Amino acid sequence: MKKSLLALTLLALPALAVSTAASAAEGVSYNYVEGGYTATNLDDAPDSDGWGLNGSVAIAPNFHVFGSYNQQDFKDINYGYDQWRLGLGYNHEISQKVDLVTRVAYEKFKGDDFTVGGVRFPGDDLDGYSAEVGVRAGLTPFVEGYAMAGYEDGKDFDGDFYGRLGAQVKFNPNWGITGDVKFADNDTQWFVGPRFTW
């Protein structure tokens, strides 16, 4: 139920931004929804993959809310997990085509329940937060890119710094294909899929 509600919310984001215009660098929009393939490569555990949804809505000239949800399953074992985050971002135009972006978010990780020797155990249920800063730019009329540095922490896991790189190739003003990679201490996370921008 929670998965369906979050997925529907992300898909409904375009309706929430009816009259809000963001003050953003040329070629950059904070009103979008995207979905696609996601994967995680871990140093000390099996890799996982699945699907994900991401979205953002400008709520004021320099502020946007954003969210993401992904569901992945580990390869070769019967175990999966859900991750989601919801946050607030601030964007400040530092040149005609470049924005400085800062974002903070609440994060949630929920692992599947599992059974060992006929005994059922609850999956991990972890809460945390993240903060990141970076730049986002319209590199050409058809290509947008970003680079971010961040930190995430939670009460049940150790904090970690990470880097994030991403780009979008635009087919027209509304549609494009986007890719994102996040590098952390123990894992690398990937996302690729179509984006609808308004």
Give a label for each model feature.
Residues 20-23, 41, 52, 59-61, ...:
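Outer-membrane beta-barrel proteins
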